[in-house]
Each structure stands twice: as C-alpha cells, then as structure tokens.
C-alpha cells in the first residue's frame, strides 16, 4: 500500500477540483424534477465541467471487466446503490431518489463527491434514510484527524446507521484520492475503533457511506456497472473529499450550494 501525503500546494489544486464538483452538483440540482432523463443530466454535467476547464473523470473510467464507463456522472435511482449509467430510458418520477456521483480532473488533481437528491416529495421513511446517511458521513469525517486510525471512520459510520436498522454495504468503499481518482487506502464504512492504519496530516480521502434501507446485500446488473440492493429497497450515498488535519479534518468538496437549492425546492 502506497499512500501519498499531499503538500499544501497540491491541496490547493484539489480544493479547486472539488469546488467544481460541488458547483456541478448544484447545477444538476436545478434540473432534477419529474420527467427529466438521466441522460439529460449527464449532458448538463459534462458541458458544465468542460466549460470550467476540467475533464469529467468518470468518462471512460474502466470497471474490473475492463469496460469503460460511458458517461460523465453516475446516476443511481432508488435501489441502485452506485454506478448507475445515464440513459434516455431512465426518467425521473415523483418520489424517486437519485444519487449523483461526480468526479473532475482539474490541473492534474481529482475531485470527487456524491449527493442523494429527492425528486419532488418523498416518503418519510426515505427522508430518514437520507438524513441518517448524510449524518453518518459527517460523523465519519469527525474521526478523520491525525493520530486516529482508519477504522475510527468506519466505526462512526457503521454505528450510526445500524442504530436505525440500516444496512452498511461492505463490498464498496471510499478511497484515497489525488493525482489518481482511486488511491490507497480503501476507506471502509465499517470497522472498529483503533483499527487500521494511522491517519497522518496531508492524507486526502474520499469518504462515502453507501447505506441501504434494508439488507446490506448487493448485486450487479447485466450492464456490469449498476450495483443494486438485493431486496430492491432504496439506498443512499453521500461523499466528501477531505484532508486529514490535526484537530479537525478539512472538507474540500461542498454541499452548501446543493443544500441551498434543496431549501428552495423541497
């Protein structure tokens, strides 16, 4: 395992890439409504990213089968946990939730973030799933400080979500991030206190709880990308890119613009 500690100059570049991801998610939030296709959302995202001088990192990113991802964002609706492929056949409906995962490459460094949006009015049960999943993200981030261990992050996420009876997906993880989208170490959403590698200042991590309303078991669809819950119950996914610091982690990505939109629309 090779972990690259980032310099302050490198972190500045990563901050720019992640700010663009946050702005892209906010731009997409303006378009999320019943009747919109996920392919339309993908076109909005790619144009926005390229207009800001960056590259959509996910486009042509290979899966374990060596097949390139065909779009600029992942659009995962309801029981799709991650890696949903945008399509003109995938039309948003009132009451859906959609997790949009977005990555950018800007000036040689990557940004990565995900947000689960409500499409119109959603049920109270699903609202709670989204709330708890987002809370677990920030509880995990609170543990991402120099001197703690990687397992402290996973424990905080797992403990919070399981208190509500939710499933914590284990086969999918967060990751280190920098010049490459996926770097060491893998950042699990489960674990025990004091386990795993020691966290050091300058580590950049993408922390991303993927939480299911029911059982944590997942399956792969025939498209070899979309990962779904086996029981077909909804899943939520939130992600921030952070820097490990002394005392308090620094969040490089942002939900501020997205949450402002949500306050207006939902």
Can you say where each PLM-predicted feature lies in the sequence?
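Active-site neighborhoods and metal-handling regions in enzymes and metal-associated proteins
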Residues: 1-266
């Amino acid at each position: 395992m090779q972990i690259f500690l980032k310099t302050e100059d490198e972190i500045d570049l990563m901050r720019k890439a992640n700010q663009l991801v946050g702005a892209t998610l906010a731009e997409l939030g303006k378009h999320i409504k019943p009747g919109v296709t996920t392919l339309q959302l993908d076109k909005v995202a790619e144009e926005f990213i390229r207009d800001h001088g960056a590259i959509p990192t996910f486009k042509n990113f290979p899966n374990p089968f060596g097949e390139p991802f065909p779009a600029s964002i992942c659009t995962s609706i309801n029981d799709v946990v991650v890696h949903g492929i945008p399509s003109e056949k995938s039309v948003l409906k009132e009451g859906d939730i959609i997790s949009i995962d977005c990555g950018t490459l800007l000036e040689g460094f990557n940004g990565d973030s995900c947000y689960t949006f409500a499409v119109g009015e959603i049920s109270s049960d699903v609202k709670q799933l989204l709330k708890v999943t987002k809370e677990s993200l920030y509880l995990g981030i609170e543990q991402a400080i120099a001197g703690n261990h990687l397992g402290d992050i996973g424990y905080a996420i797992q403990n919070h979500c399981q208190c509500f009876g939710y499933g914590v997906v284990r086969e999918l993880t967060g990751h280190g991030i920098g010049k490459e989208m996926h770097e060491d170490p893998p950042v699990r959403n489960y674990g025990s206190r004091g386990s795993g590698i020691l966290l050091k200042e300058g580590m950049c991590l993408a922390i991303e709880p993927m939480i299911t309303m029911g059982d944590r078991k997942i399956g792969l669809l025939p498209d070899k990308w979309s990962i779904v819950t086996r029981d077909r119950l909804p899943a939520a996914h939130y992600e921030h890119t952070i820097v490990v610091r002394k005392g308090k982690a620094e969040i490089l990505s942002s939900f501020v613009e997205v949450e402002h939109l949500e306050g207006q629309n939902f």
